[in-house]
């Protein structure tokens, strides 16, 4: 007999142990909207007119309960939030060695014009082709406000939407999977692509691996998982404070990359600012400290800038599903590629990230 889990089990195993990645999977799949992040709080003040008072939460990096979980209050079977989390004690996330399963590793770049592309623009090109061919009907990505750099979960519904959202800054202010509920439960999309850091893709893998009936609509809707190489992400407020202290305004930032143990920030005037990772460690999210996955081992395709020169992306095609999306984009002239990729450079960061987890 399956034990009934609730957000309280999730809180005990993940939230209270600083293991939460902030992906937002639990928030997205909760059928009664019981969970929320402080940044998305449904109540901004205390109300004296009713008994249902939700006091604004303290500053924490994990979700909070609005205290109307049906499992806790009425013993209604659910467990959706718990079963969607990739960081519970007994998750479905595999732990392969090194780079994991790879069918093919290539150096690639987009053949179409992409404004604000992160390096080779490969992810955007794959999604653009997929929209053109009707392979997907939506894509969950992150998009930032070019003035404030505030990131937000964005549901792209067309090729034009994807082109508009190109580029990533590795900042966190809200869960990337916030748009998942909108895509599946409101828009009723059936061919979704999800692009995110390894923690986000692990959450999707966890959902796809679950037999919880409440997660079935999400399992049936997700078609493609693309992971972005990630060493760590930063709390938006803390990083903006750091930039401001150094005389940098958010609107001046064009892109952010982690290269050779440094956070490299490229400004719109062409200048670059570099920080040693230890100098921005205070801005790193706590959940990143327990993550040893640099490339996104559970994805269909992993993409990053390590192992190739400027203007290109390293692409790790992990299965036949991912290969199909990549090859169709190549066939239709969206991407060019060759096999001149330095996997040793990628492996070094893979091992470095794993060592950091063991050290902590």
UniProtKB/Swiss-Prot annotation:
Limits of the 4Fe-4S ferredoxin-type domain: 11-40
SUPFAM superfamilies: 4Fe-4S ferredoxins
InterPro entries: 4Fe4S_Fe-S-bd, 4Fe4S_Fe_S_CS, Co_F420_Hydgase/DH_bsu_N, FRHB/FDHB/HCAR-like, FrhB_FdhB_C
Superkingdom field: Archaea
Protein name (Swiss-Prot/TrEMBL): Uncharacterized protein MJ1349
Annotated coiled-coil segments of the chain: none
UniProt GO MF annotations: iron-sulfur cluster binding; metal ion binding; oxidoreductase activity, acting on CH or CH2 groups, with an iron-sulfur protein as acceptor
Organism: Methanocaldococcus jannaschii (strain ATCC 43067 / DSM 2661 / JAL-1 / JCM 10045 / NBRC 100440) (Methanococcus jannaschii)
Keywords: Iron, Iron-sulfur, Metal-binding
Family: Belongs to the FrhB family.
One Pfam assignment: Fer4
